[in-house]
């Protein structure tokens, strides 16, 4: 493996070097290894000198970390460090480098991440292997101190418990609850990154439930917390609003925008709820309210603009399948949400249906078939694919203005619905026939 060459260069230069953290954890679990982190007695300047012939990225030199690019792979190499105070709840006030791996491991967050390996020998000062075997997330040393140093560790604990299907140790749970207000001191971007990993896990609802169990859901997704225990009074639903949303979340594919939409798609039901004359719960227009709710939350968490736009489309259109899909309605939907979102929308709708008393997804399956027919046909799906333009209208006597755009939209919709052939001569013929009573200089 490529990292062995980096280790050899450091060792040959006189600096003991270890595999550390997540790579060792995943290796012991038999999981696929993604990121390889090394820790060494070499200081940042020495690391940079040893690898001066390679591409280096200073991602945190003052904190002792250098990223080395070797054979197109990225490796983070960090100098041994000692424990320090964390007044900003994120970074140590002062970086104290250490000369021993033992001192370095003491500062790490959880026992399963506080193991190191050198020459095939594992150093495990805090029984990390035992906690891996017993599926426990346990803090290194005093959990209150670890959480106080950097409260993001609370979300990391939830993420590891969710992704690995582990339990959070009781004292660590208590520390997280005790320091819960500290979450407000974490940057939105760091919170977002942990939430993404939770939502993309095999069992995302477990992560949401853990956040609630640890009193964190009200800080991160207060709109989701409001759904807990909300009775829908609906013959279509066997679960309360929260449980329904958890089912939807778990049934969606591991796609971030689809899962985020699944989590929030019904948050607007609380504000639109009323009982009809038969005592049945109604939520007219709840998708529009849900859309506004998730828009505000995603902006708060600093998600990219394009991601927000696409996720909003899924929430806004998740009720479209309540009407029987036709080729015309699928075309219209395709125009609304775009190629990049329509399959994700169908995935969301399917998960939504399967989380009710109904399990009939025939309408959605039919919509997918119709969509395939549309995509495989020569029918244009975008305006620039129409064999006609505003210049053509001007050439046959129309003047620039509002009317020009209205006629072009009319032509576009007719061609899209296969009611008019996408051929300039046919389009011109249609326009002349329709507008022949107007005083045009054709």
Language-model features and meaning:
Residues 1-442:
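Catalytic cores of the polymerase beta-like nucleotidyltransferase superfamily
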């Amino acid at each position: 493996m490529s990292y062995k060459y980096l280790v050899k260069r450091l060792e040959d230069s006189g600096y003991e070097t270890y595999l550390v953290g997540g790579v060792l954890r995943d290796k012991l679990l038999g999981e696929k290894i993604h990121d390889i982190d090394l820790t060494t007695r070499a200081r940042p300047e020495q690391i940079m000198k040893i690898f001066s012939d390679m591409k280096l990225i200073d991602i945190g030199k003052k904190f002792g970390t250098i990223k080395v690019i070797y054979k197109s792979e990225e490796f983070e190499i960090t100098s041994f460090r000692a424990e320090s105070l964390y007044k900003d709840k994120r970074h140590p006030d002062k970086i104290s480098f250490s000369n021993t791996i033992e001192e370095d491991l003491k500062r790490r967050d959880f026992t399963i991440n506080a193991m190191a390996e050198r020459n095939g020998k594992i150093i495990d000062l805090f029984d990390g292997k035992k906690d891996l075997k017993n599926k426990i997330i346990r803090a290194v040393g005093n959990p209150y101190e670890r959480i106080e140093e950097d409260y993001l560790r609370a979300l990391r604990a939830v993420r590891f418990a969710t992704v690995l299907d582990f339990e959070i140790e009781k004292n660590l749970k208590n520390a997280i609850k005790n320091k819960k207000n500290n979450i407000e001191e974490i940057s939105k971007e760091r919170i977002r990154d942990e939430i993404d990993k939770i939502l993309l896990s095999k069992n995302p609802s477990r992560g949401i439930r853990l956040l609630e169990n640890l009193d964190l859901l009200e800080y991160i997704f207060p709109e989701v917390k409001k759904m807990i225990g909300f009775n829908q009074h609906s013959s279509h639903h066997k679960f309360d609003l929260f449980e329904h949303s958890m089912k939807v979340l778990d049934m969606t594919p591991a796609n971030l925008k689809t899962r985020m939409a699944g989590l929030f798609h019904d948050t607007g039901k609380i504000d639109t709820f009323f009982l009809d004359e038969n005592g049945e719960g109604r939520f007219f227009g709840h998708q529009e309210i849900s859309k506004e709710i998730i828009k505000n939350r995603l902006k708060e968490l600093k998600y990219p603009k394009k991601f927000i736009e696409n996720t909003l489309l899924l929430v806004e259109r998740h009720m479209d399948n309540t009407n029987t899909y036709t080729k015309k309605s699928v075309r219209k939907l395709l125009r609304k949400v775009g190629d990049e979102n329509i399959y994700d929308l169908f995935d969301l709708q399917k998960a939504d249906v399967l989380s009710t008393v109904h399990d009939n997804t025939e309408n959605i399956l039919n919509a997918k078939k119709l969509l395939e027919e549309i995509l495989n046909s020569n029918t244009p799906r975008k305006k620039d694919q129409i064999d006609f333009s505003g210049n053509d209208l001007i050439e046959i006597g129309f003047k620039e203005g509002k009317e020009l755009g209205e006629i072009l939209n009319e032509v576009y919709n007719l061609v899209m619905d296969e009611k008019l052939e996408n051929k300039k001569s046919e389009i011109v013929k249609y326009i002349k026939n329709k507008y022949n009573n107007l005083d045009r200089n054709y």
